[in-house]
Swiss-Prot record:
InterPro entries attached to this UniProt entry: Cys_knot_C, Cystine-knot_cytokine, DAN
GO molecular function, one term: BMP binding
PANTHER family: BURSICON (PTHR15283:SF7), GREMLIN 1 (PTHR15283)
The keyword rRNA processing is assigned to this record: no
Signal sequence, renumbered to the chain: 1-22
Protein name (database record): Bursicon
Compartments reported by the entry: Secreted
Sequence ranges assigned to domain CTCK in this UniProt record: 29-119
Protein's job: Final heterodimeric neurohormone released at the end of the molting cycle, involved in the sclerotization (tanning) of the insect cuticle, melanization and wing spreading.
GO cellular component: extracellular region; extracellular space
Disulfide bond entries: 29-78, 43-92, 53-113, 57-115, 75-118
Pfam families registered for this protein in UniProt: DAN (PF03045)
Protein's GO biological process: animal organ morphogenesis; chitin-based cuticle sclerotization; cuticle pigmentation; sequestering of BMP from receptor via BMP binding
Length: 153
């Protein structure tokens, strides 16, 4: 009976730990094996083993602790950290006279993967919700805390 409680408690702790990781947003970014199909017009596509960066990284948008009228954002993305190149020969049976039957193609793959800042959004690219028409309805317009700036006058 004691063993049953210990095993049950261990399973519960593991489940809670995984749930906490998902809620907190633990960084999980790694190089994952994939198969890429290299193609070139007139050549036979060739599958080659490669790597891709896959995973998730912590990101957030929140009200600033010191300036409540401003927002703080952190946007992290799973990206490559360095790259490697490989030269692969493709067979081209439909090569025109004078062209080679084999063509060298250069391909790239990530060397390592890590959470790095996403490309920044320029201020001019952000359209206020009032202009975009998104703030006309929804939970933020009916809340006493979130009113359109035109309603405050």
């Amino acid at each position: 009976m004691l063993l049953y409680h210990i095993v049950g408690a261990s399973v519960l702790i593991c489940l809670l730990n995984e749930t906490a990781k998902a809620i907190i947003g633990v960084d999980e970014c790694q190089a994952t094996p994939v198969i890429h199909f290299l193609q070139y017009p007139g050549c036979v596509p060739k599958p080659i083993p490669s790597y891709a960066c896959r995973g998730r990284c912590s990101s957030y948008l929140q009200v600033s602790g010191s300036k409540i009228w401003q927002m703080e954002r952190s946007c992290m993305c799973c990206q490559e950290s360095g790259e490697r190149e490989a030269s692969v020969s493709l067979f081209c049976p439909r090569a025109k006279p004078g062209e080679k039957k084999f063509r060298k193609v250069i391909t790239k793959a990530p060397l390592e993967c890590m959470c790095r800042p996403c490309t920044s959004v320029e201020e001019y690219a952000i359209i206020p919700q009032e202009i975009a028409g998104f703030a006309d309805e929804g939970p933020f317009t009916t809340s006493a805390h979130f009113r359109r700036s035109s309603d405050l006058q």
